[in-house]
């Protein structure tokens, strides 16, 4: 080989080394576009109950005849421990036959409750609700909490709580829930 060929190979090798030395240390990451959120957009629908594996035993259309939904039970504070159906070892064949105390029943009971501001706290009232149940529902059921705020705090339904609304409803709430609420 002649000297010009060696010189051309040396220049090409030097150019490759310069290009490699000028490259960044870490690998360039491609910028991906963010995917749009799929599914339900609001939080209430994303956490809705009754969706998924535990909704019913068979989700196929041919097995829907055998699925019988459990009737809603009414709240009874003196009954045995109330458990959720079809979760784990629990089944719908429990001996408790009461209805679950639902949101509709709660508001019907409150609407039918007479104002008891003048009554003494000694009287046993059937209209009072268990505080433990109420707190549990407020923590675990955002729809229930929202409806309680609308019923008790926002009297004129304008989405702003006023001090006089709070004071009026606080006395009504104490009358309904009993003396243990502060």
From Swiss-Prot:
It comes from the Eukaryota. Neuropeptide stimulator of juvenile hormone synthesis. It is found in: Secreted. Residues 51-72 are annotated as: Disordered. This is Allatotropin. Residues 1-22 form the signal peptide. Residues 23-37, 55-182 form a propeptide. It comes from Spodoptera frugiperda. GO terms for cellular component: extracellular region. Keywords: Amidation, Cleavage on pair of basic residues, Neuropeptide, Secreted, Signal. One of its GO terms (biological process) is neuropeptide signaling pathway. The keyword Signal applies.
